[in-house]
Amino acid sequence: MSIIKEFKEFAVKGNVMDLAVGVIIGGAFSKIVDSVVKDLIMPVIGVLTGGLDFSNKFVLLGTIPPSFKGNPDSFKDLQAAGVAAFGYGSFITVAINFVILAFIIFLMVKFINKLRKPEEAAPAATPEDIVLLREIRDSLKQR
């Protein structure tokens, strides 16, 4: 019975609940960032680079089998057929997703830190030499 009680206390603590909410919101936010990159940023980059589509950029590492019936210029078709290919275009897209997500999280943390009240610093401890001088002064006053 004590294990169940301990688990309840652990699960209901603020940190665990905050983490759960953060993971859920993070998952939803990740989808928004993916859409922004895929649907808004990458098409603009494609136009600026003359119609370059990063999602389909790859380097063929193996040979295409004669029985291959898909499009040899399609990374997804080659992957589905088991052909070895290095998909650097997908990596570029994911890297852009990461940079955008990291920047947005940085801005959020910066904003939250601004909202927090600065903690008052504890008064600095009196240096030992000052304490000693005060003791000497007090001792001399008593004489």
Curated annotation (Swiss-Prot):
PROSITE patterns from the UniProt entry: MSCL
MF GO annotations: mechanosensitive monoatomic ion channel activity
Keyword Zinc-finger tagged: no
Family: Belongs to the MscL family.
Assembly behavior: Homopentamer.
Record's bilayer topology term: Multi-pass membrane protein
Superkingdom to which the source organism belongs: Bacteria
GO cellular component entries: plasma membrane
Biological role stated in the UniProt entry: Channel that opens in response to stretch forces in the membrane lipid bilayer. May participate in the regulation of osmotic pressure changes within the cell.
UniProt name for this protein: Large-conductance mechanosensitive channel
Subcellular location: Cell inner membrane
Transmembrane portions of the chain: 10-30, 89-109
Record-linked Pfam families: MscL
Keywords: Cell inner membrane, Cell membrane, Ion channel, Ion transport, Membrane, Transmembrane, Transmembrane helix, Transport
